């Protein structure tokens, strides 16, 4: 066993897992004790009523059909099923969270000329206008922007020098929100600049996911950073208590400088994302830099999760800055998605579906995981069947072998409809990007899997008629040139891989 795993087991995370296991055992023990205490007829009656109420709750709940099937399978497990659903099946907002949500929705970061922009877009394309209207109705943090210059980076290696340069230019505040941070060249270089900026009076706020960093940072790392002047906190901190909210991780990658410059994409703050450390071959990731009005939406997204996590913030207005418009063509919507009931709709899934359903020439997709529901599968198939050139790229070298088996299990249905599947042979492709018809693209953190589309807090940038779409197209062409196309007539999986795929597919909504 590695030192990292031993340290993890001996940390607060190991203790929390142990305590939650004890809590689960205690719940089962209490149930069996009550079963012994009551007469048999009463125990059976209670059991039947519990099963019926649990099944009715699952059937009537507003959730994806695949999730209902999974929970119904779990619910019929004697005793354990309804207890597991009671503990992990559905998250309800506390009164405090409801107040927070109302406060966030009341904040107005939207542009004064937003309506005029939408009407302008409506005149150009009613279909695109419909997509914009859909995104803005699902994510109240989002808005349509122009006056923004964008830069697409096909690799984290290429993004890193520019990111450091931008950090050095900060004058007022820096916001960072990431899923994974690990000490090394990338993070240490960033941290050195952040500490310099703190000395200059720049406000620095850092939010990272507790579970995402549990194997990379010590438990007291936020305290260490706060002593150095960085306002650092863990998102959805692990405590020894059973709760469904542990499933809702902060998978976002957001960096904002003075409300004027912003970054997002697939790259976390660890050395493999800039290929300074080799894991699973060459690490292929992408990012987008925004300069101008659209950064306001990234600022708002950060403040939203900061507020959800911390419960309060001193003054929203001081971050509501009039950022300078920059000469740049195109329209942009930085948007967020996340779990119910914080988000009422699956924003990321809806954005992907809109792009796929409206494509007329081609749709290109990269994703590290391909574990999607029936609706999204059919949308992709139907696009190919109507003559759209649909191509999907996944990794040849996986970071999770079992997940790759499920990913490959999705290939045959898609290929039968004419979808072209590629595997990135140089290594692990972690990019999450979609491009269609040289007109619209999405770059961000949203994988084509249930965790990203249903459970996690995610973010991305919708881009329409941006000059950078040509770079994204060139990046896809480069990816295709070094990837292997999977052919339906030669694609095979072993019997045990098929068995694993079939079993895991039942629990795909939890993967």
Name each model feature, range by range.
Residues 2-41, 115-511:
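Charged, low-complexity intrinsically disordered terminal segments
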Residues 46-117:
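Transmembrane alpha-helices and immediately adjacent membrane-cytoplasm interface residues
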């Amino acid at each position: 066993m590695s030192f990292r795993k031993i340290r993890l087991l001996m940390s607060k995370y190991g203790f929390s897992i142990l305590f939650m296991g004890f809590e689960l055992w205690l719940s089962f023990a209490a149930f069996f004790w009550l079963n012994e205490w009551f007469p048999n007829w009463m125990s059976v009656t209670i059991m039947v009523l519990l099963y019926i109420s649990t099944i009715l709750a699952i059937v009537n709940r507003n959730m994806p059909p695949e999730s209902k099937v999974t929970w119904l399978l779990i619910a019929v497990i004697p005793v354990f099923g309804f207890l597991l659903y009671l503990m992990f099946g559905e998250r309800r907002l506390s009164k405090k969270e409801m107040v927070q949500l109302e406060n966030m929705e009341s904040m107005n970061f939207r542009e004064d000329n937003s309506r005029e922009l939408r009407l302008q877009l409506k005149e150009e394309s009613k279909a695109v206008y419909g997509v914009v209207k859909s995104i803005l109705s699902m994510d109240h943090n989002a808005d349509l922007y122009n006056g923004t210059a964008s830069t697409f980076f096909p690799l984290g290696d290429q993004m890193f020098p520019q990111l450091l340069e931008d950090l050095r230019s900060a004058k007022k505040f820096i916001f960072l929100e990431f899923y994974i941070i690990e000490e090394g060249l990338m993070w240490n270089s960033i941290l050195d600049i952040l500490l310099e900026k703190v000395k200059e009076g720049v406000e620095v706020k850092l939010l990272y996911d507790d579970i995402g960093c549990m194997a990379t940072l010590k438990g007291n790392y936020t305290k260490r950073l706060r002593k150095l002047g960085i306002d650092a906190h863990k998102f959805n901190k692990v405590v020894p208590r059973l709760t469904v909210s542990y499933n809702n991780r902060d998978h976002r990658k957001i960096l904002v400088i003075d409300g004027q410059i912003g970054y997002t994409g697939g790259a976390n703050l660890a050395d493999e994302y800039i290929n300074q450390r080799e894991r699973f071959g060459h690490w292929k990731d992408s990012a987008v830099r925004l300069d101008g009005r659209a950064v306001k939406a990234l600022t708002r997204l950060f403040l939203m999760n900061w507020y959800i996590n911390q419960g309060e913030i001193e003054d929203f207005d001081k971050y509501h800055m009039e950022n300078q418009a920059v000469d740049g063509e195109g329209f942009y919507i930085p948007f967020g998605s996340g779990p119910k009931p914080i988000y009422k709709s699956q924003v990321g899934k809806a954005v992907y579906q809109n792009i796929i359903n409206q494509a007329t020439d081609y749709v290109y997709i990269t994703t590290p995981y391909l574990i999607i529901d029936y609706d999204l599968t059919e949308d992709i198939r139907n696009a190919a069947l109507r003559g759209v050139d649909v191509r999907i790229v996944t990794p040849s070298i996986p970071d999770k072998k079992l997940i790759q088996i499920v990913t490959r299990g999705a290939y045959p249905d898609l290929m039968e409809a004419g979808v072209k599947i590629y595997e990135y042979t140089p290594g692990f492709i972690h990019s999450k990007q979609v491009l269609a018809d040289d007109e619209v693209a999405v770059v961000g953190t949203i994988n084509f899997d249930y965790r990203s589309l249903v459970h996690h807090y995610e973010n991305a940038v919708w881009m329409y008629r941006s000059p950078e779409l040509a770079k994204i197209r060139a990046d896809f062409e480069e990816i295709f040139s070094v990837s292997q196309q999977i052919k339906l007539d030669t694609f095979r999986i072993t019997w045990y891989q098929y068995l694993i795929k079939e079993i895991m597919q039942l629990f795909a909504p939890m993967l």
